[in-house]
Amino acid sequence: MKLNTIAPAEGSKKDRRRVGRGIGSGFGKTAGRGHKGQHARSGGYHKVGFEGGQMPLQRRIPKRGFRNTLGVRVVEVALSQLESAAIDGVVDLEGLLLRRIVRGSPDAVKVILTGEITQGLTVRGLRVSAGARAAIEKAGGKVED
């Protein structure tokens, strides 16, 4: 077998339909468009979503929700994830982003009481729930706002 002899399997490729190229082709003369009428003319048929005067689907279905421009996107981080995000005993947004615990650009990060913590860590610049704050301080750490 050589590269110049490789060919696709018989019947696996279908030729493009070349319309308007003679009566013998089966798609000559009117090129599969029939005789006269809106469909036969150039310049399009109807706009996308047009349903012949019936109320279109995108207008029949009610609107839902809104995008809150004043909303604050808070990402929750479990207490058990803090130890892996600590850099020199300090946990901050930079460390969480670096370790891929938090992705994107959240408006705020909140530490919640899920799991447990064994090391005394300093949590800096993050929101902390009351339960998580107590657990951090119990482990010998501190929370700096």
Curated annotation (Swiss-Prot):
Coiled coil: none annotated. InterPro entries: Ribosomal_uL15, Ribosomal_uL15/eL18, Ribosomal_uL15/eL18_sf, Ribosomal_uL15_bac-type, Ribosomal_uL15_CS. Belongs to the universal ribosomal protein uL15 family. It comes from the Bacteria. Binds to the 23S rRNA. It holds the Pfam family Ribosomal_L27A. The keyword Ribonucleoprotein applies. Keywords: Ribonucleoprotein, Ribosomal protein, RNA-binding, rRNA-binding. Residues 1-52 are annotated as: Disordered. The keyword Kinase does not apply. GO terms for molecular function: rRNA binding; structural constituent of ribosome. One of its GO terms (biological process) is translation. This is Large ribosomal subunit protein uL15. Residues 21-31 have a biased composition (Gly residues). One of its GO terms (cellular component) is cytosolic large ribosomal subunit. Part of the 50S ribosomal subunit. NCBIfam families: rplO_bact. It comes from Acidithiobacillus ferrooxidans (strain ATCC 23270 / DSM 14882 / CIP 104768 / NCIMB 8455).
